[in-house]
Amino acid sequence: MGAGSSKPEASAGSKHIFESNSPIQFSSNLVDGLQSNTETDSARAKSLELEIQNRVAKELERLRAREQQTLAEIEKRLSEAKDTGSFASAPSAPAVTHYPAGSLDLDAPRIPFAGREYAPPPPAAVEVAAVNKELNRESVNSEIEELRVKLEGRKKLAELDEGVAKAQKDVVSCLRLNDRRPLDCWKEVAEFKKEVARLEEGFVDRIVG
C-alpha cells in the first residue's frame, strides 16, 4: 500500500517535456546549403511554368515553320504546273524554210496533172495533235485542282487546333493553382503532349496523302 501511494498518478492528457542539456548542432554543409538556396517553392513553380510555356511555344513555332515550308513547296508546284500547261497549250509556229531564188522547193504544193484531182493530205496528224493537246490540258488542270484542294487543307493549320489550345490552357491553369506542387499537373501535361502529337500526326498524314 505504501508503494502504491508513493507514485503520483498521471492525469489524463498530461504531457511530458524532455529537455536536453546539450545544444542541438547541424553540420556546416547543411547550414551552408540552406543559406545558399534562396529559391522558394513558389519561385520553383513559376520557373517550371515558364519552362513549360517556352517548350509549348517552341513546339507550336516548329509546326508553323513546317507548315509554311509545305505551303511554299505546294505553291511552287502549282506555278510550275501552270507554266507547263501554258507551254503545252500554246500553238507551235510552223517551220518556215527559205530557199534561194530560182531553186526547186520539193516541199512546195504539187500542181496536179490534167485529168487528176488534187487530194489533200489526210487529217490524221492534225487530229492526233489536237487529242494530245486536249489530254495535256486535262491532266494539268486535274493536277492543279488536286494541289488546290491540298493547299486549302494546309491553310487550316494556320489556326491553332482547339484541342491543343484547350490542353495548353489547362496546363497553365493547373500550374497557377498548384504553384507549390507542380508535379500534380502531370495529367494536364500528358494531355497536352498527346494533343500536340495528334496534331503533328495529322499534319504528316496530310502531306503524305
Curated annotation (Swiss-Prot):
Family: Belongs to the MICOS complex subunit Mic19 family.
Location(s), subcellular: Mitochondrion inner membrane
Name of this chain's protein: MICOS complex subunit mic19
GO annotation, cellular component aspect: mitochondrial inner membrane
Organism: Emericella nidulans (strain FGSC A4 / ATCC 38163 / CBS 112.46 / NRRL 194 / M139) (Aspergillus nidulans)
Function: Component of the MICOS complex, a large protein complex of the mitochondrial inner membrane that plays crucial roles in the maintenance of crista junctions, inner membrane architecture, and formation of contact sites to the outer membrane. Involved in osmoadaptation.
Stimuli inducing this protein: Down-regulated when grown with elevated levels of potassium chloride.
Keyword set, alphabetical order: Coiled coil, Membrane, Mitochondrion, Mitochondrion inner membrane, Stress response
Residues forming coiled coils: 48-86, 127-156
Membrane association type: Peripheral membrane protein
